[in-house]
């Protein structure tokens, strides 16, 4: 099973070869732990959680069809993901909703504790900002990582990851805070000097009007120049969830 802990050899390669990496490649290396976490979330719930939900919440066939239209998944794949969602949502509180403690348990094997990195993952899934992740929000977020999701969807998602204050801009302090939190959770070692250099080069390249922050338009241009930033935002197995997680098909209790 994937552990979600990037190999420290990656950090060594970055520190010893930083001069040969482009700005985009360096910044991409910082992004890798976050996107790996989405992979860990799906695979860990699929393989390790063994609870059965008794929540009265159900998903009607009409809901499955609607979510299939709103995402890159087929109706059968949405149904399979509903089984995965139910496993995660009953791990602590069996109410058919994913609470932050349940997400933390899935990602870090510990239900409690404060972490900016976890907060950002949760906030990006929690579209309604009501403190829980509902199934349709779960589908919408995972759909961004589907191979058929558009480049613009992935670009927008990555922008929101670093726009901590939700001002419509990425500020240097936000990047510093977010990257530090990601590195802390991933055991990825980067020196302060190298991290500062990566952020300096990123803003020098992306902040075209030199106002100290990156707008959405500037971000779009930057990602277009450095497509490697989005390389890890695609999970190939989401193209066929029913094959990747066949047990969900046979365990489904979704009502037609």
Swiss-Prot record:
Induction: Not induced by abiotic stresses. The keyword rRNA-binding does not apply. The record marks 186 as: Involved in dimerization. It is found in: Vacuole membrane; Endosome; Cell membrane. Disruption phenotype: No visible phenotype when grown under normal conditions but hypersensitivity to salt stress. It comes from the Eukaryota. Ca(2+) binds at residues 207, 209, 211, 213, 218. Its main location: membrane. PROSITE patterns: EF_HAND_1, EF_HAND_2. It holds the Pfam family EF-hand_7. Keywords: Calcium, Cell membrane, Endosome, Membrane, Metal-binding, Phosphoprotein, Repeat, Vacuole. Residues 77-112, 113-148, 150-185, 194-229 form the EF-hand domain. GO terms for cellular component: cytoplasm; endosome; plant-type vacuole membrane; plasma membrane. Phosphorylated by CIPK24. The level of phosphorylation is enhanced by CIPK24-CBL10 interaction. The phosphorylation is induced by salt stress and limited to membrane-bound CBL10. InterPro entries: CNBL1-10, EF-hand-dom_pair, EF_Hand_1_Ca_BS, EF_hand_dom. Expressed in shoots, leaves, stems, flowers and siliques. Barely detected in roots. GO terms for biological process: calcium-mediated signaling; hyperosmotic salinity response; monoatomic ion homeostasis; regulation of potassium ion transport. GO terms for molecular function: calcium ion binding; kinase binding. The modification Phosphoserine is found at residue 247. Homodimer. Interacts with CIPK24 and AKT1. The N-terminal 40 amino acids are necessary and sufficient for vacuolar and endosomal targeting. Acts as a calcium sensor. CBL proteins interact with CIPK serine-threonine protein kinases. Binding of a CBL protein to the regulatory NAF domain of a CIPK protein lead to the activation of the kinase in a calcium-dependent manner. Mediates salt tolerance, but only when phosphorylated. Competes with CIPK23 for a direct binding to AKT1, negatively regulating its activity via a protein kinase-independent mechanism. Belongs to the calcineurin regulatory subunit family. This is Calcineurin B-like protein 10.
């Amino acid at each position: 099973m994937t552990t979600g802990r990037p190999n420290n050899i990656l950090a060594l390669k970055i520190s010893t070869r930083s001069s040969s990496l482009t700005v985009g490649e360096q910044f991409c290396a910082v992004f890798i732990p976050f996107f790996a976490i989405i992979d860990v979330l799906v695979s860990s719930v699929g393989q390790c959680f063994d609870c059965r939900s008794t929540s009265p919440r159900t998903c009607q066939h009409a809901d499955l069809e609607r979510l299939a239209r709103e995402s890159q998944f087929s109706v059968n794949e949405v149904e399979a993901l509903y089984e995965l969602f139910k496993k995660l949502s009953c791990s602590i509180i069996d109410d058919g909703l994913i609470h932050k403690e349940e997400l933390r348990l899935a990602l870090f094997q510990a239900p409690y504790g404060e972490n900016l990195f976890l907060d950002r993952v949760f906030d990006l899934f929690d579209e309604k900002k009501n403190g829980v992740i509902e199934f349709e929000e779960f589908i919408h977020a995972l759909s961004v990582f589907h191979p058929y999701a558009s480049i613009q969807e992935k670009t927008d998602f990555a922008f929101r990851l670093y726009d901590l204050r939700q001002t419509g801009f990425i500020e240097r302090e936000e990047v510093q805070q977010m990257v530090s939190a990601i590195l802390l959770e991933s055991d990825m070692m980067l020196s302060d000097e190298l991290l500062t250099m990566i952020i300096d080069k990123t803003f020098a390249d992306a902040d075209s009007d030199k106002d100290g922050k990156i707008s959405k338009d500037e971000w779009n241009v930057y990602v277009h120049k450095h497509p490697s930033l989005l390389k890890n935002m695609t999970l190939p197995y989401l193209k066929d969830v029913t094959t990747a997680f066949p047990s969900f098909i046979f365990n489904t209790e979704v009502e037609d």
